[in-house]
Regions:
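Flexible, glycine/small-residue-enriched loop-and-beta-strand segment within the central core
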Residues: 35-43, 63-74, 78-134
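Terminal amphipathic alpha-helical/low-complexity segments used for targeting or macromolecular assembly
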Residues: 1-56, 96, 129
Length: 134
């Protein structure tokens, strides 16, 4: 999935970095400037980049998503403006769960016991009908 030895090279392969570049361009042009009510459009765009988004999910335009292909959003879930989904690994948000403004879900950290501090990732799962607040 990724290089754990960041001393020998970047943590993620070129393909991943190019995909994130394409996502960031699409996000800047087609996702973030959309009106708040266009949840279906944003869900479609996320699906086009590999996310799994359930019916009637509300993903607001101010959400920042690192890698949509690592995102799964359940039916009727809500992700508010100002949320950061740092999805270096999988983020699964259950049905009818809410991620409130200012929440930051981060799947990555660094091994501070190693001299090169290599990247370490673990998935995050937010259960059904849960509420994550900042």
């Amino acid at each position: 999935m990724h290089n754990t030895d960041t001393f020998t090279g970047p943590s993620f392969p070129l393909r991943n970095r190019l995909a994130r570049l394409a996502w960031n361009l699409a996000c800047a042009i087609l996702f973030r400037p959309t009106p708040v009510f266009m949840h279906a459009w944003r869900a479609w765009l996320l699906r086009a980049f590999g996310a799994r988004v359930g019916r009637h999910a509300h993903v607001y335009p101010g959400v920042r998503i690192w890698a949509p292909w690592n995102l799964e959003v359940g039916e009727e879930a809500g992700i508010a403006d100002g949320v950061i989904l740092y999805s270096q690994d999988r983020i699964m948000i259950g049905r009818r769960a809410v991620i409130s403004q200012g929440a930051h879900l981060c799947t990555g950290t660094h091994d501070t016991s190693h001299p090169w501090h290599p990247l370490m990732t673990k998935p995050i799962s937010v259960g059904e009908q849960s509420w994550v607040a900042a």
